[in-house]
Regions:
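A structured beta-alpha segment of the ubiquitous adenosine-cofactor-binding alpha/beta core
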Residues: 45-63
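Short beta->alpha connector loops at strand-helix junctions that form conserved
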Residues: 14, 19-21, 48, 68-69, ...
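Phosphate/pyrophosphate-binding betaalpha-module
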Residues: 39-45, 59-60, 68, 72-75
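Hydrophobic/aromatic ligand-binding patch that stacks against planar heteroaromatic rings
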Residues: 8-9, 56-57, 80
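ALDH superfamily catalytic-core signature
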Residues: 39, 72-219
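Conserved small-residue-rich beta-alpha loop and adjacent elements
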Residues: 1-42, 85, 107
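Periplasmic-binding protein-like
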Residues: 7, 64-68
Length: 219
């Protein structure tokens, strides 16, 4: 999310000031170390820091600002850019539904939905938020999604090196509050919906545990 816009800007002949997220300090530190080794420091500078440093950075009269993140910070970026009439590209979060009907390959659709939803623990702006399926394929799709989740992350997702961790405590607490809302008490234990919920629940149970990755090992 940081490197692709940087590459585009450089390819178009621009200089770049790159500010990685403070929520992933290890990645930020790595970029600050690697970028000067491989790219001209006159063309690319990496700035580390938190909200205070970002606020100071936004006071500069850039020619263009490209921001990827949440809506709250997006508003701050837009207000700061307005002081200099700086053009802004905001790549914010959104709702991403999937629609599946009988023309789809159910196995392929299920695997792609499961992959898209759980990559980086769903912390991407294009992660599917919900699935709309026609009645003639809904049951088969639900069954295949449950299978796909288990295939990707195993019966015990916390042991999977491919299942991401939640990036900060605030987001972790928000997800924990949402978990009771997602229960389906009226469904039979063998129903496809419960099978999906069980597979998701196994993954969410892992998310709901406070591992070192949540507090000290952030990427």
């Amino acid at each position: 999310l940081a490197l692709e816009p940087m590459a585009d800007a450089l390819a178009a002949g621009n200089a770049v000031c790159l500010k990685p997220s403070e929520l992933s300090p290890n990645t930020s530190k790595l970029l600050a170390e690697l970028v000067p080794q491989y790219l001209d420091s006159e063309a690319v500078r990496v700035v580390e820091g938190g909200p205070k440093e970002t606020g100071e950075l936004l006071k500069c009269p850039f020619n263009h600002i490209f921001y990827t993140g949440g809506g709250h910070v997006g508003k701050i970026v837009m207000r700061a850019a307005a002081e200099h009439l700086t053009p802004v590209t905001l790549e914010l979060g959104g709702k991403s539904p999937c629609f599946v009907d009988r023309t789809a390959d159910i196995n392929v659709a299920a695997r792609r939905i499961a992959w898209g939803k759980f990559t980086n623990a769903g912390q991407t702006c294009v992660a599917p938020d919900y699935v709309l399926a026609t009645p003639d394929v809904a049951e088969a799709l639900a069954e295949r999604i449950a299978v796909a989740i288990t295939e990707f992350y195993g019966e015990d997702p916390k042991a999977s090196p491919d299942f991401g961790r939640i990036i900060n405590d605030r987001h972790f607490e928000r997800l924990c509050k949402l978990l009771p809302v997602g229960t389906v008490p009226s469904e039979e234990p063998s129903s496809p919906l419960v099978q999906v919920a069980s597979a998701v629940g196994a993954a969410m149970d892992m998310v709901g545990r406070r591992f070192n990755a949540v507090t000290t090992g952030r990427g």
